[in-house]
A protein has these predicted regions:
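N-terminal secretory signal peptides that target proteins for export/translocation
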Residues: 1-12
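Bacterial N-terminal signal peptides
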Residues: 15-27
Length: 258
């Protein structure tokens, strides 16, 4: 082989190697995103201030009363036992939250940003440092890992089905969690995992998650339970100190006091 041919092949090999490295870097690392969509880009950009369908200056106050058929005997809506109280979901939050004016898009709630490689083989959530539970403790990666495991092992069968294609969950930092998916073509998996409610490990780890309970749970959402009487009523009160009240996804929402 002549020296010229060797140099040519060497340059081609070097160029090919560089292209492969660049491609792998693109697949392995995704820039942090404020929101994700199943196809294309989400409607709202990274600097949006509120959803279009809300009044960001809506006054706070007042009461709303709703009728519910039947009774309730538990404040744990995540297992198969008992009848959860209507509206109990207002106590809990998910990593991401959808908007009401577009399909298959989600934006950061507990998660401040999301990282997804081009092939959607994983999703990484970066949690907001200000995110807190009602008891004042910070929401961390440990809470996310705990929530995933307890929902999958002791929650309703829905969660086992939902998370069946999650191959691995890793804590990358105090506020960073990575979900790696099994091989396949399900582009919806990052959105599915983003809908996962985040529960307090401190509160739940020494309690029976599979049991019915009327002990008021620790959540992180915009409302707390003010008072209740089983079989008759439950009153939710807006949390004045709710950590997420000024987030773009929440601005103009949760205006009723009770």
């Amino acid at each position: 082989m002549t020296r010229a041919k060797y140099r040519c092949r060497h340059r081609l090999a070097a160029g090919w190697f560089g292209w492969v490295c660049a491609l792998l870097a693109t697949v392995a690392v995704g820039a942090p995103l404020h929101g994700i969509a199943l196809h294309g880009q989400p409607k709202y950009g990274p600097n949006f201030e509120h959803f279009d369908y809300v009044n960001p200056n809506a006054p706070k106050g007042g009461e709303a009363r709703f009728a519910a058929i039947g009774s309730f005997d538990t404040f744990n809506p995540f297992n198969i036992k008992g009848q959860p109280a209507a509206g109990i979901g207002q106590l809990f939050e998910t990593l991401l939250i959808g908007s009401a004016d577009e399909p298959f898009s989600e934006y950061g709630l507990i998660a401040e940003s999301v990282e997804i490689p081009e092939d959607r083989s994983s999703v990484t959530f970066n949690l907001r440092p200000q995110a807190k539970f009602h008891d004042g403790t910070s929401i961390t990666a440990d809470d996310v890992l705990f929530s995933f495991e307890i929902l999958k092992t002791k929650g309703t069968p829905l969660y086992r089905f939902y998370y069946a294609n999650v191959a691995k969950v890793e804590k990358l930092g105090e506020r960073q969690v990575k979900f790696t998916f099994a091989p396949g073509e399900n582009r919806e998996l990052p959105l599915i995992v983003g809908q996962m409610p985040v529960l307090s490990e401190k509160y739940w780890r020494d309690r029976d998650f599979a049991a019915t309970t009327l002990e008021v749970p620790v959540g992180s959402g915009p409302y707390r339970i003010e008072r209740f009487e089983p079989g008759r009523f439950i009153v939710y009160q807006r949390d004045e100190n709710y950590w997420g009240k000024d987030l773009p996804v929440n601005r103009g929402r949760y205006n009723i006091d009770r």
